[in-house]
Amino acid sequence: MHRRPSKQQVEREILSEKIKAVFHEHKGRYGAVRITKVLHNTGIMTNTKRVGKLMHLMGLYAKGSRYKYKHYNRKGASLSRPNLINQIFKATAPNKVWLGDMTYIPTKEGTLYLAVNIDVFSRKIVGWSMSSRMQDKLVRDCFLQACGKEHPQPGLIVHTDQGSQYTSSRYQSTLRQVGAQSSMSRKGNPYDNAMMESFYKTLKRELINDAHFETRAEATQEIFKYIETYYNTKRMHSGLDYKSPKDFEKYNS
């Protein structure tokens, strides 16, 4: 004769299934803290310690960095601008301060370069562009895409490093045409653009490191999906009180 499972066992099994569902919905990108927040948002009251223990028992582990991902070597900077934000990554409203940076994505077909602009207010990716060539057109296309979507007012601060793409006369002219101010990090100081660096670290941990893209087109498609259908709209950010950029803007703009 089999003993009927206790109430605690039933509750644990139900909670385990809920945890597993959230874990797989976010493709292994959420750890115990964020999964607990998701459960709270759906009315399930539990705590991070219990969620973490159940995840361990089920063999569920959030994606983590396995190796240090190198940026490309930035050369040829010929112009510097003042640092207008001084590591203060705060804004009072959308489209007051944007950050910009580039990185590279390996594929079996060859390297794909990615440029991104982030709005400091909500951490939303307002613009992004990809190319097989690391030229100033890449960062100009990214910035113009962001302007086309967000329509920033004159006075917008755009903070980047001193890479040659950002110091180029064509990029700087593009900023001036929309009334934007150029701000730049000190040479060799990644902390001056820490929020931007944090995004790339997240992108690589949650998508790139496990991807092994065959072609640039495949990488472009997956990065598009990650940014537009996940990062901006669903992914919780601890710095936004565990809201997505979309929800943070909705409740704070």
UniProtKB/Swiss-Prot annotation:
NCBIfam families of this UniProt entry?
A: transpos_IS3 (NF033516)
Question: Boundaries of each Integrase catalytic domain copy?
Answer: 90-253
Could you give a single Gene Ontology term from the biological process aspect? Answer: transposition
Of which family is this protein a member? Belongs to the transposase IS3/IS150/IS904 family.
Name used for this protein in its record: Transposase for insertion sequence element IS904
Q: Does the record carry Aminoacyl-tRNA synthetase as a key word?
A: no
Q: Which organism is it from?
A: Lactococcus lactis subsp. lactis (strain IL1403) (Streptococcus lactis)
Q: Which SUPFAM superfamilies match?
A: Ribonuclease H-like
Q: Supply one GO molecular-function term.
A: DNA binding
**UniProt KW keywords:** DNA recombination, DNA-binding, Transposable element, Transposition
Q: Which gene carries the instructions for this protein?
A: nisX1
Role, per record:
Involved in the transposition of the insertion sequence.
Q: Which cysteines are joined by disulfide bonds?
A: none
InterPro entries noted in UniProt: HTH-like_dom, Integrase_cat-core, RNaseH-like_sf, RNaseH_sf, Transpos_IS3, Transposase_IS3/IS150/IS904
